[in-house]
Amino acid sequence: YDFLHIDYKVGGVRRFDKNGLLWYEEYPSKEPSFVMNGFVYTLLGIYDLWRITGDEKIKKTIDKCVRTMKESIHLYDSGYWSIYDQDKKELATEYYHKNIHIPLMEVLHKLTGEEIFDSYNKRWKKQLNSKFNKAWLQIMYRIQPRLRRYSK
């Protein structure tokens, strides 16, 4: 658990965003990536540790992580699909959207009781079942790399 508190600047995974929110990076680097599923999986690991130990310090870390997700979850919604990260703002693959992002929202809602996670769970499930969204997603998968290339 202590290794999580090593800042990314010195080889760790901890980072704070411009709003002072705590993040654990799946891919620590100079520029923040803020990969949603990597952060949430870290949160779930910390939660398991707290369940075993009951340590209040660990519970405070969980509370900070939940706050981060509550205040940042909107950044992972394109309006028609979930987003993988905040660096490249990659649209999640259908596999990730269906099998990772949606279930993670369900788990976060069950563990925290926070309605915002249930709201995104339902929203993303609805997006998954939209034929229009799936067609638009295929177009965006082709366009996004080109847009990034030309915007540099």
Language model feature labels by segment:
Residues 1-17, 56-80, 119-136:
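Long, well-ordered core segments of solenoidal/helical folds
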Residues 7-23, 33-46, 73-74:
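A structural motif
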Residues 18-33, 80-88:
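Acidic/His metal-coordination segments adjacent to aromatic residues that form catalytic metal sites
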Residues 34-50, 93-110:
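Well-ordered alpha-helical segments within folded domains of soluble proteins
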Residues 61-108:
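Glycine/small-residue-rich hydrophobic helix-like segments
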